[in-house]
């Protein structure tokens, strides 16, 4: 019975997600929407012992709409900028690069503010799912190569403040 319900409901949910994404793309292309970075806070990376690594200015994606759009359609982002995605619970996450122009490092962070996985050099426009591997409550997107440049790895920590 559960399998039948999933069979009937899942295709409908997937088609709605596709419709939303296509509508957002159509709207952005028709309106020639230009997205620019808006600093909403600052995020600091530190190693597992608390030693400072680096910090970045962040935009915050804390609503379903902001999380769905993320960094889509952006054609530039400075090296000291990124986006922090906030989720209400820690659970497996998965991101994709649909309509995302810039190559990114996608940093998954658990509820203890520890990096649990990094999807490095995610390819622009790629619809392949990039899973968190372990449960995550936060996700930080930065330019591709950022993690390697600063040596960010699993076990490192983040902390942020809003403006």
Describe each model-derived feature in a short phrase:
Residues 1-2:
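Hydrophobic H-region at the start of alpha-helical membrane spans
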């Amino acid at each position: 019975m559960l399998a039948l319900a999933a069979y009937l409901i899942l295709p409908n949910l997937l088609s709605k997600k596709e419709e939303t994404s296509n509508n957002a793309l159509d709207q952005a292309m028709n309106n020639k929407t230009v997205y620019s970075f808006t600093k909403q806070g600052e995020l600091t990376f530190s190693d597992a012992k608390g030693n400072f690594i680096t910090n970045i200015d962040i935009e915050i994606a804390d609503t379903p709409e902001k999380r769905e759009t993320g960094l889509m359609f952006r054609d530039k982002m400075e090296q000291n900028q990124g986006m922090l995605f906030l989720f209400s619970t820690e659970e497996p996450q998965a991101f994709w690069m649909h309509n995302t122009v810039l190559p990114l490092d996608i940093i998954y962070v658990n509820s203890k503010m520890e990096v649990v996985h990094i999807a490095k050099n995610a390819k622009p426009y790629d619809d392949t799912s990039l899973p968190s591997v372990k449960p995550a409550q936060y996700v930080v997107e930065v330019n591709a190569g950022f993690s390697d440049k600063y040596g960010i790895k699993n076990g490192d920590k983040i902390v942020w403040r809003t403006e």
